[in-house]
Amino acid sequence: MQREKDSLIVVSGGMDSVTLMYEKRASIALALSFDYGSKHNARELSFARLHAERLGVEHLIIPLDFIGQYFQSDLLLSGGDIPEGRYDEENMKSTVVPFRNGIMLAVAAGLAESRGLRRIYIANHFGDHAIYPDCRASFIRPMTEAVRCGTTNGVLIEAPYTDITKTDIARIGASLGIDYAETWSCYKGGVFHCGVCGTCVERKEALHDAGIPDPTEYEG
């Protein structure tokens, strides 16, 4: 019997959310992306759109212009340079977009309730915890309860990658046959991945540690 498509996924076009979309594709009715003024938004969104179309999933892109206009973060077009080097708290703290996941999950909750969908998937993972407060289990748990209590149909948030690493995610993706050349990580948002910013370094390490050949085209 075919499973009911009762879920929404927040998908950026990066490795993690694309992997989750393929893993949960049997239940996903809607893929939701946000244009919030980040340096890499355009590159990410093109891949979010590609994979949604490939899976036959409706795809919405909702603009969140106010984030780029009023929030402070070097990840935004309005911010400073993207730091290079390792993906760790000290190096990447300038790229925190305040309460980004909270805002996106709130919008996703309203949309899920409007569509009669029962579940929201989000692909935060263990490696994000030290850097981004709204990727931690200590945020996801109460946000899940708030959304459940605040929606008439008791919408649930599911974040199945919260306690696993990006290497683990890469292995899942490989088992699903995902071509990671068709995903975007680089925060600089150029024509090619820069290869030296924190997210590029994390991407390289995850694929290497998973034993997966890196198909990414890097600058130089």
Swiss-Prot record:
The keyword Cell inner membrane does not apply. Pfam families: QueC. NCBIfam families: 7-cyano-7-deazaguanine synthase QueC. ATP binds at residues 11-21. One of its GO terms (biological process) is queuosine biosynthetic process. InterPro entries: QueC, Rossmann-like_a/b/a_fold. Pathway: Purine metabolism; 7-cyano-7-deazaguanine biosynthesis. One of its GO terms (molecular function) is zinc ion binding. Catalyzes the ATP-dependent conversion of 7-carboxy-7-deazaguanine (CDG) to 7-cyano-7-deazaguanine (preQ(0)). The keyword Zinc applies. Belongs to the QueC family. It catalyses: 7-carboxy-7-deazaguanine + NH4(+) + ATP = 7-cyano-7-deazaguanine + ADP + phosphate + H2O + H(+). It comes from Porphyromonas gingivalis (strain ATCC 33277 / DSM 20709 / CIP 103683 / JCM 12257 / NCTC 11834 / 2561). SUPFAM superfamilies: Adenine nucleotide alpha hydrolases-like (SSF52402). This is 7-cyano-7-deazaguanine synthase. Its cofactor is Zn(2+).
